[in-house]
């Protein structure tokens, strides 16, 4: 296999970051501070019972309802998932300067195309295959089967959000700091995006099955990244590399021991497709420009820090980030392509868009490492652009979702 081959659809989205950023040092300090604060009696610190900050009680209920609606045992039940039709209307029912009577406008100002049975459907499958062919890594003839299989796996390998939300409050705080630390390490080592998302999935699934003390959260995070790299990377980091980034807190024997234990708990099942696979598919079909793709990638990484997003499927998370990105960039329409491929319309995503916007309000406290990474020229300073947009659109941020 040629390691120099690039994925055409996402070739500009790598993990480059300026070496001048002291990401690891800042995150290490955060982890140590939270460990000291919660090391004495963490058991009595639980999530507050009031509504989640930043979204309404209706949206809070909707998030839990959406999670419960597709919850299934990954080990005992066969998930039956109907294949979604990939045929899309790419050149019909387009939005012109004069809005079509078949369009509605969302609260974010995006024109939403409604279905029209009279629209022409000429050569849709051929057009879709041509767009798939733009990326050599896509097997066109098996596209529908691959997507159907991915949809099954994304549910099968979801963490148990209800168990995670019942954990002591210090676990949530430590998780956020550890994820910021993982992002910093992942960026410095220059790993694939898939490795980052899989590592958080491994960590969350482990946390939903085991109670982890604060003192071992960082070890679990490093081990989750180690496992994900072995699964995704051609040249994964070594145990010695992890010892260096852990700065002597844990030795190789500790890492290997935790690796064995985590894999045993997870029953060696690591086939989660992750959001990058769905993002690549939607990028090809929708011909998204570089700015929107990078912005979606930024939102996906921000969502890793917020535990409430672990209740979403990978495809649902990508759809949420895509809608938010289109809102900020003032894209002209929310086409039928994304709902037909992912199965989510914009109305089913509004609650999660509000939550994402709330997370983006204060990047320096919520996701400093990710903000710093995407503030670099390599990523077109996309995080600063988003922060400026939020600062000048306080009316959107004040919406309660009603």
Swiss-Prot record:
Family matches, as PROSITE patterns: CYCLINS
Pfam families: Cyclin_C, Cyclin_N
Keywords annotated in UniProt: Cell cycle, Cell division, Cyclin, Meiosis
Listed GO CC annotations: cyclin-dependent protein kinase holoenzyme complex; cytoplasm; cytosol; microtubule organizing center; nuclear envelope; nucleus
GO molecular function: cyclin-dependent protein serine/threonine kinase regulator activity
The keyword Cell division appears for this protein: yes
GO process terms (BP): cell division; nuclear DNA replication; reciprocal meiotic recombination; regulation of meiotic cell cycle; signaling
InterPro entries hit by this protein: Cyclin, Cyclin-like_dom, Cyclin-like_sf, Cyclin_C-dom, Cyclin_N, Cyclins_cyclin-box
Segments crossing the lipid bilayer: none
Family affiliation: Belongs to the cyclin family. Cyclin AB subfamily.
Function (record text): Required for pre-meiotic DNA synthesis and S phase progression. Regulates levels of meiotic intragenic recombination.
Protein name: Meiosis-specific cyclin rem1
Organism in which the protein naturally occurs: Schizosaccharomyces pombe (strain 972 / ATCC 24843) (Fission yeast)
Native organism taxonomy: Eukaryota, Fungi, Dikarya, Ascomycota, Taphrinomycotina
GN (gene name): rem1
């Amino acid at each position: 296999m040629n390691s120099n081959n690039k994925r055409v659809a996402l070739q500009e989205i790598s993990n480059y970051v300026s070496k001048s950023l002291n990401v690891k040092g800042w995150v290490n300090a955060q982890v140590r501070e939270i460990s000291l604060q919660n090391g004495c009696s963490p058991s009595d610190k639980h999530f507050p019972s009031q509504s989640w900050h930043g979204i309404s009680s209706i949206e809070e209920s909707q998030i839990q309802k959406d999670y419960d609606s597709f919850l299934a045992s990954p080990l005992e039940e066969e998930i039956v998932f109907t294949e979604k039709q990939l045929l899309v209307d790419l050149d019909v029912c387009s939005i012109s300067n004069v809005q079509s009577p078949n369009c509605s406008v969302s609260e974010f100002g995006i024109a939403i195309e409604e279905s029209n049975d009279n629209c022409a459907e000429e050569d849709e499958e051929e057009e879709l295959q041509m767009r798939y062919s733009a990326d050599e890594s896509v097997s066109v003839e098996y596209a529908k089967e691959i997507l159907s299989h991915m949809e099954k796996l994304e549910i099968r390998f979801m963490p148990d959000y209800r168990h995670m939300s019942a954990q002591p409050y210090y676990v949530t705080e430590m998780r956020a700091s550890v994820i910021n630390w993982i992002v910093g390490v992942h960026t410095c080592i220059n790993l694939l995006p898939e490795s980052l998302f899989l590592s958080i999935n491994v960590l969350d699934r482990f946390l939903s099955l085991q109670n982890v003390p604060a003192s071992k959260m960082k070890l679990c995070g490093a081990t989750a990244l180690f496992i994900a790299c072995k699964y995704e990377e051609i040249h994964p980091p070594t145990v010695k590399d992890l010892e260096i980034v852990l700065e002597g807190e844990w030795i190789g024997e500790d890492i290997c021991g935790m690796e064995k234990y985590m894999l045993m708990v997870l029953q060696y099942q690591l086939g989660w497709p992750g959001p990058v696979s769905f993002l690549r598919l939607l990028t090809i079909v929708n011909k998204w420009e570089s700015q929107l793709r990078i912005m979606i990638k930024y939102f996906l990484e921000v969502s890793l820090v917020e535990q409430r997003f672990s209740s979403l499927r990978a495809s649902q998370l990508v759809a949420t980030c895509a809608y938010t990105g289109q809102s900020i960039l003032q894209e002209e329409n929310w086409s039928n392509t994304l709902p037909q491929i992912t199965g989510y319309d914009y109305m089913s995503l509004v609650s999660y868009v509000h939550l994402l916007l709330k997370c983006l309000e204060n990047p320096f406290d919520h996701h400093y490492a990710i903000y710093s990474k995407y503030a670099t020229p390599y990523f077109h300073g996309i995080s600063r652009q988003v922060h400026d947009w939020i600062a000048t659109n306080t009316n959107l941020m004040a919406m309660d979702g009603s």
